[in-house]
Every structure is written in structure tokens, then in C-alpha cells.
A protein has these predicted regions:
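Short, tandemly repeated low-complexity microdomains enriched for cysteine and small residues
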Residues: 27-31, 111-114, 136
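Charged, low-complexity interaction regions
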Residues: 24-26, 107-108, 148
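Alpha-helical oligomerization segments
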Residues: 130-172
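Conserved mixed alpha/beta catalytic, RNA-binding, or beta-rich assembly cores of soluble enzyme
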Residues: 36-46, 62, 67-129
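N-terminal interaction modules that seed assembly of large macromolecular complexes
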Residues: 2-72
Length: 172
């Protein structure tokens, strides 16, 4: 699953709305935007860290002249060295940070829900909002059936169609 910056506002709104509606947290209506902003800040900080890891990975690969097919392995090593969780672990980290924030936030009046139940609910919201990259890849490849993978023309078209699919889904 991948978190896109464009999904953050809707996701933060859904998290606060769902937990408030279920009675897990109490938030004054006038303070709701600030509570949502706290959640947005957590997700945006995660994306900033992710961006730093990707940039450092690219620099290392360029310095050592490593091919792009090793990107995932090198990124994992860089992320581990920085203590930055990736993939589903990253989502679990974000959820943990959100729950910790509820306990200290001046915009959340009261927390009644159990951590485990709220964690499960928030993870469900993330699954609903986040996009599986494999689904995007399948959709793009289905549109490029008439081209042979691996050619330069296919690579160019793949990137163009991927951008169109992401734009269509509101991810960019």
C-alpha cells in the first residue's frame, strides 16, 4: 500500500469522523479541524522521511553505479539504517503515532476507545483509502497489451499511462 499526499486530508477527516462517531474519541466540533491537522502532520512527516530515504537511495545507487533493479533492496537497507519503517510497517507506524497523538493532543477532549480496537479501525480506513501499487500496475499493463514489455517505447508508454491512471484516481 502506498500513501499519496493527495489522500492525506480525506484520510485525516475520515479518521477523526469515524472515531468521534463511534464514541472512541471526543472532539469539540470547533476543534475538529485542528485535530485533523495533527493527523495530517503525522502523515506528511512520514512522507518527508520516505522522500529522504528515496533520495539517499538514489545517491548511493548513483555513486556505486548500481542498477535500478536493486532499488528495493538498497532502499530497505537505507530505511533500516535510519530506523524508518516502510510498506505496511510504515502504515502501522503512522497508526501508532496517531494513537499516541490522541493521548497528548489538546484538541482531543477524551479518549474512550481501546488502543487495539481503534488501531484496527484506523487500519481499516487506511486500507480503504490507500492504493495498492500492484493494482495500478495491473491496470496499466492491461492497457498496454499490444506492446512488448522491456522495449524503450513500452517504458515510455508505461510511465505515461501510469500517470494518467494516477490522475484519474485523484492520486496526483
Amino acid at each position: 500500500m502506498r500513501l499519496y499526499r493527495s489522500q492525506i486530508p480525506r484520510l485525516a477527516e475520515d479518521i477523526i469522523g469515524t472515531l468521534a462517531l463511534s464514541g472512541d474519541i471526543v472532539v469539540e466540533v470547533s476543534l475538529r479541524p485542528e485535530a485533523e491537522q495533527d493527523i495530517r502532520a503525522i502523515m506528511e512527516e512520514y512522507l518527508r522521511q520516505e522522500h529522504r530515504v528515496v533520495q539517499e537511495t538514489r545517491e548511493i545507487m548513483e555513486q556505486r553505479q548500481i542498477t535500478y533493479d536493486q532499488f528495493g533492496r538498497i532502499k530497505g537497507q537505507v530505511a533500516d539504517s535510519k530506523g524508518h519503517p516502510t510498506g505496511d510497517d510504515g502504515i502501522r507506524w503512522i497508526v501508532g503515532q496517531i494513537l499516541e497523538n490522541f493521548m497528548i493532543s489538546k484538541y482531543i477532549d477524551e479518549v474512550f476507545g481501546e488502543d487495539r480496537a481503534m488501531r484496527r479501525g484506523i487500519m481499516g480506513l487506511f486500507r480503504k483509502h490507500l492504493v495498492e501499487e500492484a493494482d495500478l500496475d495491473r491496470e496499466v499493463r492491461s492497457r498496454l497489451k499490444n506492446m512488448r514489455p522491456g522495449t524503450s517505447k513500452w517504458d515510455i508508454e508505461y510511465r505515461r499511462v501510469m500517470e494518467d491512471v494516477r490522475r484519474k484516481r485523484g492520486l496526483i
